[in-house]
A protein has these predicted regions:
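Compositionally biased, intrinsically disordered low-complexity regions
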Residues: 14, 440, 495, 501-502, ...
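Short Cys/His-rich zinc-binding micro-motifs
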Residues: 887-906, 910
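Extended, charged helical/alpha-beta scaffold domains that provide interaction surfaces
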Residues: 36, 309-317, 323-330, 560, ...
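Hydrophobic, well-ordered secondary-structure elements that form the walls
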Residues: 437, 485, 788, 824, ...
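Short, Lys/Glu-rich amphipathic helical modules
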Residues: 432-445, 679-680, 734-739, 898
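Generic detector of short, well-ordered, non-transmembrane alpha-helical segments enriched
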Residues: 6, 380, 481-482, 666, ...
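Proline-rich intrinsically disordered, low-complexity coils
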Residues: 66, 197, 223, 434, ...
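Conserved P-loop NTPase motor core
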Residues: 1-600, 604-622, 671-672, 688, ...
Length: 913
């Protein structure tokens, strides 16, 4: 037992203890089963209004939980024909408590999430259920939506193709299903709109994240980016591509695979200087050219077609490295996407300008309560706890797990490994046992498909290129004789049933008969209060289901006798979780099954991270290319290598988060001020405060150093009289200035003059029919948006270059904090200056319209990929938003410092201010 496990056991924090506590609450729910069974449909439905009344009356959700869970469990039975298992209730309690429920594949996570969603929807503040793709959001939202609606709870579904009005309506529902990408992008867009009614989200109160490890761990380093069209030509991408195409690896450039970086050698630098006619490519004047060359190198040397991306209809489409799915409409940042387009000889689109960005770390930490489900989370509990303050509870399985996980089989070469994989498939297929073969990318899946096709083995292939057939393929992957080759996308959110899936087959037949999905959804339930056409469809469903179940039951027995579904992994992933997800496709609900990984020393994980210990063992044994080595010790060595990679990646994410915290504090301040303006608050006091600030700042700049201020300087006079004072203001105080010893004496006079001047402006503009309060909002919004977007780019540039400070024995993160704070202050000053100048000096004949921060119809949504510029990310907590409305971006003394240190402003960068 480790010290950590010993500590947990000593202080009652072991998983077993947590499960015992959950079981006690579960028993209280189960004890009410008969009570809710006895209710009619209308009586059961009326419970929702009753529960809401109790919440409004002050009863806590924990107090209502046993009744709410019991009522909804009964609703699931009546609508969907499923009686939730005790372990699903335990998982639901765990989610309600704001934790991660680790539930194995096939344990019913989709239904589990409905229990806490229903309970928390009683507050009428909104619940978000987050999925990894549009298909699952739509499928789960429609499926579970029938149950929620039966109980009088509204459900919205967010998908990529919705317009703003549809999104707003979906978020206004009690429960909203959507993907992490869509919800993150909606948050960014909400902070770019120019009117509050254009916002679609209504807050972040409770979120349930499906496949939480994929979203909060795997994608934590990938910022969401909204970008607009840049104005630079694309010619240089094509020129750089032609140059890079002539370079040779090792001679002209080197690749650091672990760091995923590429660098020109001295010879490569000389070739570049000669080709482009520059004297020194390292000069600052040539930085842009060097950037084009490096991105072209990354496109050629590191980004692989059918692995990292595919080309379809003349377009480069990213393949999600964790799920294997196509990410249509997403683009790599920092010119990498354009470099790939040039490499593939398709149209090169103009580089974009980052307008808004956030990471999933930032986004999900805004929720007041967040929870998650996955089949694989315990290995990452330290990270969940350290970054998100989420602990992991392993929920017991409903039936004992009997799956056999065999030791890895290791080969010297990829050729030998794949030859063995093909033989294993042929051998097992001959018995009729269903086989699922997991591959790491599209390229490998298609190669393996060709190999077994030549051996005459019929099979299905599931990858990013044919994802539309995913449901069909997965539904029958457990049938006798089935052979399925799939990338990582297979099985997240879907179950493989041994012998086939009678429910899926019955629904498919009904669709073929012309019945709508809505009718089919209602037909599969047991509630009595439905129209005649649904009752007729229910009879049809029951008939088809019984017919197919006879077939699948017979096949189920045969597959059970054959050993269940056999999983073949063709390569270990960097993360043990991804491997465990593949293993988890077999052995659901107590079914038999088996898994085994086939590995070669040429695989990326082995070559980069496992070679120093395992390779010598292989050499000592004198293995041939096609000679396998299978041993428990070897499997442990491989898992040790994976642990090292996981630790390395966690360290990277922690470092990124340190930088993220800085940018996020600044974003909270800007978005908070922007929100105040959008809500229609009277901004006049804010404007006056900004004027005072500009006068004070001018006084500070003109301090003579001998205890007095020189107000006669032409620069100070001209600046303020062009900004917020009438011409000649200083002249009328010429005699008094000579007698003044304290700057406050003069600034107080100027305050009065500036406020009087502004009052005159208000009278004049109001006489012209201009709403002064709206004019203030328009001017302030435009100034904030313009300078904030420029600031994002400047922060990107600072982040790119800050790492060099380490060579000077300085802490890059601390340097970044300090410099970014200065940059933020400069930006705030420019926002104030622009706002004051326009309000006091601009010629106005009619009220200008609020400019959109960006025309969303012309934006692109994307990600900073490997090799793309990492956009600034940070920590986004609900309580950190500013309430001080004195000036845009102004930091209150007791607010968190924008440098990201976590200290109050008065104890950090504002000390002495």
């Amino acid at each position: 037992m480790s010290l950590k496990d010993l500590f947990k056991s000593m202080f009652g924090m072991s998983n077993e203890t947590q499960v015992r506590k959950l079981r006690k609450i579960t028993d209280a729910v189960l004890a009410k089963e008969d009570e809710y069974k006895a209710l009619s449909d209308s009586e059961l439905r009326a419970k929702t209004a009753e529960f809401k009344g109790l919440v409004q009356g002050g009863m806590t959700l924990d107090e209502i939980l046993p009744d709410a869970f019991a009522a909804f469990r009964e609703a699931v039975w009546r609508v969907d024909g499923k009686r939730l298992f005790p372990v699903q209730i335990m998982g639901g309690v765990c989610l309600h408590q704001g934790r991660i429920a680790e539930m194995k594949t096939g344990e019913g996570k989709t239904h589990t999430a409905t229990l806490p969603a229903y309970l928390n929807a009683l507050t009428e503040k909104g619940v978000h259920i987050v999925t990894v793709n549009d298909y699952l959001a739509k499928f789960q939202g429609e499926w579970m939506g029938n149950i929620f609606r039966f109980m009088g709870v509204s459900v919205g579904i967010i998908t990529h193709d919705l317009d703003n009005a549809q999104r707003r309506a979906a978020y206004a529902c009690d429960i909203t299903y959507g993907t992490n990408n869509e919800m993150g992008f909606d948050y960014l867009r909400d902070n770019m709109v120019n009117r509050e009614p254009d916002m679609v989200q209504r807050g972040h109160v409770f979120g349930i994240v499906d496949e939480v490890d994929s979203i909060l761990i795997d994608e934590a380093r990938t910022p969401l980016i909204i970008s607009g069209q840049g104005d630079q030509s694309t010619d240089m991408y094509e020129k750089a591509d032609r140059f890079v195409g002539r370079l040779k690896k090792d001679d002209d450039y080197t690749i650091a695979e672990k760091e995923k970086a590429v660098t020109l050698t001295e010879r490569g630098v000389e070739l570049a200087q000669r080709h482009f006619g520059v004297e020194n490519i390292a000069d600052l004047d040539n930085a842009e050219l060097y950037h084009y060359i490096l991105q072209a190198l990354k496109a050629h040397a590191m980004m692989k077609r059918d692995v990292d991306y595919v080309v379809q209809d003349g377009e480069v489409i990213i393949v999600d490295e964790f799920t294997g799915r196509l990410m249509v409409g997403r683009r790599y940042s920092d010119g990498l996407h354009q470099a790939i387009e040039a490499k593939e000889r398709v149209k090169v689109n103009r580089e974009s300008k980052t307008l808004a960005t956030i990471t999933f770390q930032n986004y999900f930490r805004m929720y007041q309560k967040i929870s998650g489900m996955t089949g694989t989370a315990k290995t990452e509990e330290e990270e969940f706890q350290g970054i998100y303050n989420l602990d992991v509870v392993q929920i017991p399985t409903n039936m004992p797990m009997v799956r056999k996980d065999y030791n890895d089989v290791v080969y010297k070469t990829r050729k030998g490994k794949f030859a063995a994989v093909v033989e294993e498939i042929v051998k097992r297929h001959a018995t009729g046992q269903p086989i699922l073969v997991g591959t790491v990318n599209v390229e490998t899946s298609e190669m393996l498909s060709r190999y077994i096709e030549m051996r005459g083995v019929p099979h299905e292939i599931l990858n990013a290129k044919n994802h539309a057939r995913e449901a069909d393929i997965i539904a029958q992957a457990g049938s006798v004789d089935a052979v399925t080759i799939a990338t990582n996308m297979a099985g997240r959110g879907t179950d493989i049933l041994l012998g086939g899936n009678p429910d899926y087959l019955a629904r498919r037949r009904m669709r073929q008969d012309g019945l709508s999905d809505e009718i089919i959804m209602e037909a599969v339930g047991h509630n009595e209060d439905v129209p005649p056409e649904v009752l007729a469809a229910r009879e049809t469903y029951n008939r088809y289901f019984a017919e197919f179940k006879r077939e699948t039951d017979a096949e189920h027995e045969r597959v059970m006798a054959l050993g269940g579904l056999h999983i073949i992994g063709t390569e270990r992933h960097e993360s043990r979780r991804i491997d465990n997800q593949l293993r988890g496709r077999a052995g659901r609900q107590g079914d038999p099954g088996s898994t085994q990984f086939f590995i070669s020393m040429e695989d990326d994980v082995m070559r980069l991270f496992g070679s120093e210990r395992i390779a010598p063992m292989i050499e000592r044994l004198g293995m041939g290319d096609d000679q396998p080595l299978e041993a428990g010790l070897l499997t442990k060595q491989i898992e040790t290598a994976q642990k090292r990679i996981e630790g390395h990646n966690y360290d990277i994410r922690k470092t990124v988060l340190q930088y993220d915290d800085v940018m996020n504090k600044q974003r909270e301040l800007i978005y908070g001020q922007r929100g105040d303006i959008l809500k229609g608050d009277n901004m006049r006091e804010t404007v006056i405060s900004m004027v005072h600030n500009m006068i004070d700042a001018t006084a500070e700049r003109n301090f003579t150093g001998d205890g007095s201020f020189d107000w006669s300087l032409d620069e100070a006079r001209d600046y303020l009289e062009r900004l917020c004072l009438k011409p000649g203001t200083f002249a009328k105080y010429a005699a008094q200035i000579k007698e003044m010893n304290e700057p406050e004496e003069m600034t107080k006079l100027l305050y009065v003059d500036a406020e009087a001047f502004y009052a005159e402006r208000e009278t004049l503009l109001t006489a012209l029919g201009i709403d002064m309060r709206e004019f203030e909002r328009v001017v302030m919004l435009n100034a904030i948006d313009h300078h904030w977007m420029d600031h994002i780019d400047a922060m990107d540039d600072l982040r790119d270059g800050i790492g060099l400070r380490a060579y000077g024995q300085r802490n890059p993160v601390q340097e970044y904090r300090l410099e970014s704070f200065d940059m933020f202050n400069d930006m705030v000053h420019m926002i104030r200056e622009d706002t004051v100048r326009r309000l006091f000096q601009a010629r106005v004949e009619r009220l200008p319209e609020r400019h959109k921060a960006v025309d969303v119809s012309k934006t692109q949504e994307g990600f900073a990929g490997e090799g793309g510029k990492p956009a600034q990310n940070g920590q986004a907590k609900q309580g950190g938003a500013p309430t001080n409305k004195s000036q845009p971006g102004a930091v209150g003394r007791n607010q968190p410092c924008p440098c990201g240190s976590g200290k109050k402003y008065k104890h950090c960068c504002g000390k002495g201010a």
